[in-house]
């Protein structure tokens, strides 16, 4: 059963207003997601409003175990999936921003979108890794969330783009993430390296459709060309990633887009193409389980109230 906030966020007025104003690409997306009229209207309205972004802070290894953020935070008891050491700042007139504090500048906490925290909730099903690889790591959010859950023993944060790799390095150093190596190899180069990991993170490049719900222009993100191009790239990254996995390893795949071609269909392709892998059930994410897959996969939409949205699926290589 969906939690109370799921229905509470849906519009109660006429659901056809947003539908009448929607573009062909927007209507196509709603159809592909198999949304009913109310959910379609909620998604389209969020794209128009551009105000679905919701910030979170993750405490870094620099913060003591008993550290409490110096700003007021939301009660998140209705979100049992919330990862450890993650807080959601209160927002409103006169409330200070988390970035205004010296603790932020000294690396006690790291700012990111709440949707990213939701995607990392699947790591609750993963035992502490001995050797982990974040293949698409910049600017560092997923590596930071992993470090908050269990301090990495031997972690590699990889980013191909040199400029983004510099930002990644700066964030890892500022936040004091230990035992981390910054690299810039392509996924196929990692596959050729022969080094094996028991946890792989693939926060894949995508069409970024959720940016529209944050008020960020993203021309072409609903079009066939961008979606299909990203889906092809994502499959290539994953086909390389699975070659870097030990028996029993986990792979967390995530995106910040909605289209099934970049999400459920990519996962279905990998599960069919690569023998010996299975999707893992994540009980705390069960209210978000996708109806577009016959295996455990999870999607977040803006009307859920936890940010602009995203997708995640946890895979395990059979021992």
Regions found by a protein language model. Name each.
Residues 1-319:
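S-adenosylmethionine
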């Amino acid at each position: 059963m969906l939690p109370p906030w799921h229905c509470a966020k849906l519009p109660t007025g006429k659901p056809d207003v947003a539908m009448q104003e929607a573009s062909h690409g927007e209507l196509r997306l709603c159809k592909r997601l198999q949304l009913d009229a109310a959910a379609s209207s909620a998604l389209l309205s969020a794209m128009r409003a551009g105000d679905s972004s919701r910030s979170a802070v993750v405490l870094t290894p620099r913060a003591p175990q008993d550290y409490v953020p110096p700003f007021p935070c939301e009660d998140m008891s209705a979100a049992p999936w919330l990862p450890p050491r993650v807080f959601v700042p209160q927002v409103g007139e006169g409330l200070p921003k988390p970035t205004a504090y010296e603790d932020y500048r000294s690396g006690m906490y790291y700012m990111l979108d709440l949707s990213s925290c939701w995607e990392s909730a699947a790591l609750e099903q993963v035992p502490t890794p001995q050797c982990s690889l974040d293949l698409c790591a910049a600017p560092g959010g997923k590596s930071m969330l992993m470090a908050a859950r269990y301090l990495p023993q031997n972690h590699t944060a990889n980013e191909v783009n040199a400029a983004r790799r510099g930002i990644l390095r700066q964030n890892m150093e500022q936040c004091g993430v230990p035992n981390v190596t910054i690299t810039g190899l392509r996924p196929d180069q990692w596959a050729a390296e022969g080094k094996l990991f028991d946890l792989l993170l693939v926060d894949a490049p995508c069409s970024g459709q959720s940016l529209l719900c944050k008020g960020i222009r993203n021309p072409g993100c609903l079009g066939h060309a961008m979606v299909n191009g990203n889906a092809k790239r994502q499959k290539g990254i994953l086909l390389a990633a699975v070659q870097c996995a030990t028996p029993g390893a986990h792979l967390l795949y995530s995106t910040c887009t909605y289209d099934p071609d970049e999400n459920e269909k990519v996962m279905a392709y990998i599960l069919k193409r690569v023998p010996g892998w299975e999707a893992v059930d994540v009980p705390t994410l069960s209210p978000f389980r996708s109806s577009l897959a016959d295996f455990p996969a999870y999607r977040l939409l803006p009307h859920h109230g936890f940010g602009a949205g995203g997708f995640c699926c946890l895979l395990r290589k059979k021992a």
